[in-house]
Amino acid sequence: MRSNLVLAAGFSLLLVGAARAADVAEVPRADAMFAPVPMTSDEWIVTVRGTVSIAPKFEGSDRFGLFAFPGLGFRRASQPVQFSAPDDGADFAVYRQNGFSIGPVARFRPGRYLNDDARLFGLHDVRWSVEPGVFVEYWATPGVRARAELRHGVRGREGFVADFGVDWVSRLGAFTAAVGPRLRLADAAYQRDYYGVSFAESALSGRFAPYRPGGGINSIGAAASLGYQWNQAWGTTVFAGYRRLMSDAADSPIVRGIGSPNQFEVGASVSYSFRTGL
């Protein structure tokens, strides 16, 4: 446990240190995202997004599946376009000033079912979940963004999960590239839902030992994306991510027996934006 706490502290210092280092380095002229935005327009920009990805069939799985899901975002027409990483939750900034943004966020989380993998026989299903919460974001420079999300499941899984990340963002014409580290923390309820095994499940499955994980570090990893804005309406993005399960999640007999602590994901999305008066 002490080594995990040291690892978490070191990782957090890395994120903070990276943002501070970029803050003192020479950077290009600050772009529009740092300017106060007048909220006078009654028009909104609505962005509809479709995403497909290849990812583990469930958290901790060593088998991959194809996933497709929609996305929806909106902002005032007077607000500048801001970078959003593919692994960001859907959010709306209620406050945005001097590089800081804060507001509600939500994310869809797939479940885990027996038809995902017959080797799960004897274990409980994990129902898909919607996780509402709050996000905080800070642009230290036009090219460095730090973001945190705290969410809580309201269907199926009811635990808390917190995601932290820093992105180095580079814009060249219509291209936007980004890469950065990720850290996820989860409470005991979240961990037990996906990685726990009760005594009854252990006896029924005949495969998994009883296991009751606690909260703490769920994973560390990295994410990268490359986007291209074809015009004011259409954009495309390709992305990849890696998470390494840690601590109690990695020690789960589910992960050790039929899964893997190495979680990879690749995908692509298409977005369409239009103006409307709401």
Regions of interest found by a model, annotated:
Residues 46-54, 87, 104-110, 134, ...:
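Transmembrane beta-barrel strands of outer-membrane/channel proteins
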